[in-house]
């Protein structure tokens, strides 16, 4: 059975892990470590010559190719948003699939075997649409997503693997684009989520934007130039702001130095600005304060007080910032745990859950919850809840509804997710119609609506007329979710990208081999001297010229053909040079043999017989 990997598909950084010898191990990125350590940046870039770059290579070229570079796409998952690059539109699922495909390739290179299955983490506060979109992205990338689990839950798995005894923990997960606060109880191998709260539009990127706004405004005051009108300057500045934020986690001040950031009539302008940790902390105060509500909500939903919490685990890159750690400590009144890497623990926890599903890990039971209430729209535009938020999943709940008008022969089921009393204020997950209800006065027919949430947190709904036993079932899909046909089309497109990548790699390797062949052949011609006949030289030089002409074109097969022609031309000269060298060595050896006597007398040597049996 092939390995199931665990994937942390993040807004700013992504990582993956796998169980090796029962322990979660981070899968190294092909490019090595980056700003995120073993995690790699969640960047995807399309170049004008048709290449697709993912991770660190995409981030490095973002300054020179801002219009072709995409980052932070996770915030758009589960929406109808499309990003347009060089005239072509891409869905968030397609962009995320490129990141997942890179992870798949890195994992296969690391493990030396095919990887086809994965557990992918999502923010606990992701709704049904966002979870479905994540599964679709995995499918496009060629992965069977065997489970979707919540990021804080995964972090707790990584933290609690070696911990004994019962304890209540708070997982404060502040990532690049989302905040999740989860209260869990752990003990005897059982990880039970008691409540979860959060904000899917709050994270480290908001901190970057605060710093960015400050720098842009200060530069405008000093020079009169608004850098927001310059796309390339903003890309340079955005990257510098992120680096400065990271550096200020371990330093009291840092300098942003960007020469030639822009120019006006008076000439080029340079940006050189010192940022202190105190200034950054001042700028992000409003972001930190937005974290307070979800923390208090999670405690309230779990019916616990701050003093009931035994441990606080911090997850996500921004939690490395002293200001974030101090804020959580101030709100909760206790220190935070230091024994877990905030950038790696989610992927490691996903790998542990993968191990549970594969049967590699025993005695662990994960009880997660649904983050938002689920219900249907009823008469008057009211949302009637069937499943309350923070209900342990998987779960199933049924409720009887009836008709609102006389002789009504069909009912539309409008499925909703959220906490607002009016249907229009909640997230619409989908609609379907149950038909064939016998005409009857209103209030007489009995329609049983059943909500069934699976272990991935994905909803299945059915409606059944109890009189006729007619039933309609659907797996909820958002109106803008990709259809099965669209997903299959995206899978084929992804395969074409993989084929194109392989073709480009073959072309690069062939060109390198051709360049090397030309170099070694020209070196051989110089060393050959009079061994090479004029005819041989002419034939080889002509073959070199033809190969150079082929290299100036784009036909790989033509390059290979001309390489073969040059190799054949070189073969005859190589044989002649080898023969000359052999003759030279033979002559030298003969000279040595004739000098093995001393004064015309044979030199005798002592010898000892060795017994073959004891040798």
From Swiss-Prot:
InterPro entries in the record: ATPase_NBD, Chaperone_DnaK, Heat_shock_70_CS, HSP70_C_sf, HSP70_peptide-bd_sf, Hsp_70_fam
Keywords: ATP-binding, Chaperone, Nucleotide-binding
Composition bias, Low complexity: 581-600
One annotated GO molecular function: unfolded protein binding
Ranges of compositional bias, category Acidic residues: 605-615
Stretch list, region Disordered: 579-615
Any Pfam family: HSP70
Coiled-coil region list: none
Family indicated by similarity: Belongs to the heat shock protein 70 family.
Protein task: Acts as a chaperone.
Name the record gives this protein: Chaperone protein DnaK
Species per Swiss-Prot/TrEMBL record: Methanothrix thermoacetophila (strain DSM 6194 / JCM 14653 / NBRC 101360 / PT) (Methanosaeta thermophila)
